[in-house]
Regions:
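A short SAM/SAH-binding and catalytic strip from SAM-dependent methyltransferases
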Residues: 98-111, 134
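Conserved catalytic/acceptor-binding region of the Class I
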Residues: 112, 119, 127-194
Length: 256
């Protein structure tokens, strides 16, 4: 298995897009001319921006070729670029009115450097808007950590999944150095999932992908079965058989 799977990602598109809409609702800027969406995935967050600002020039970038291909298929009127924001291939300066990033930064190291780069991409008085998952202390992530570091599986993974989130206090310190006008908040979403299988599918499209990419097909099936069995133990069914999936996220908006 290679790259991200847009089809799996889009299976829960409504739930994944809601934080982008919530982030956009806190951006106070009139008639932006140019916007960039960092880590646009299959274009769902970029479409949210396009619907709000149809007259702006909007660019979506993502380091996944499959995600960019899907985004181009989904939204032909928007420009999408396959590129990695953490490298020098993306080197805009003073160019955008809005730099937007929804559920992407957790995959990118060196947030001190990254946030400075994103702010440098903004025009004066431009807005940086970011949402980052902060659910890594939730039961599902503890389960993934337990399984992937077990004697049975640890030697299968030469590359470990890493999340590069900083603490809220660290983000506050960084933003204070970059902006005199910023605010932060958290929102916890409670997604009602139809079943444990649907919860597994959610993570097959995101958090489990770095592990699945390293396994042979037979191993993929055994690995997913072990994760599934763990999910049935840590997420009890509601009375109607559904699963309540808690997902906290951190947001911040900063003006240049």
């Amino acid at each position: 298995m290679n790259d991200w799977n847009p089809i799996l990602y889009e299976k829960f598109l409504k739930e994944r897009t809601l934080p982008a809409k919530d982030l956009l609702s806190r951006i106070d800027i009139a008639s932006p001319q140019k916007i960039i969406d960092i880590g646009c995935g299959p274009g769902n967050s970029t479409k949210v921006l396009f619907d709000k600002f149809p007259n702006a020039k909007i660019i979506g970038i993502d380091n996944s070729k499959k995600m960019i291909e899907q985004a181009k298929n989904n939204f032909s009127k928007i420009e999408f670029i396959n590129a990695d924001i953490s490298t020098d291939e993306i080197n805009y300066e003073n160019e955008f009115d809005i730099v937007f990033s929804n559920a992407c930064m957790q995959w990118i190291p060196n947030h001190h450097v990254l946030l400075k780069k994103l702010m440098n991409m903004l025009k004066q008085n431009g807005i940086l808007a970011v949402q980052i998952p902060i659910n890594f202390s939730e039961p599902i992530h503890k389960l993934i950590q337990k399984v992937t570091t077990s004697d049975k599986w640890k030697n299968k993974f030469s590359v470990k999944r890493e999340m590069y989130n900083l603490s809220q206090n660290e983000y506050c310190d960084i933003l204070a150095e970059l902006s005199s006008d910023f605010f932060m908040w958290e929102t916890t979403y409670y997604h009602v999932m139809p079943s444990h299988s649907s919860l597994l599918d959610w993570y097959k499209g995101t958090g489990l992908s770095p592990y699945l990419n390293q396994l042979s097909e037979p191993d993929v099936n055994f690995f997913l079965q072990e994760i599934f069995e763990g999910l049935t133990e840590i997420y009890p069914k509601q009375k109607n058989g559904q699963i309540l999936f808690k997902f906290p996220r951190l947001f911040f908006v900063a003006k240049k």
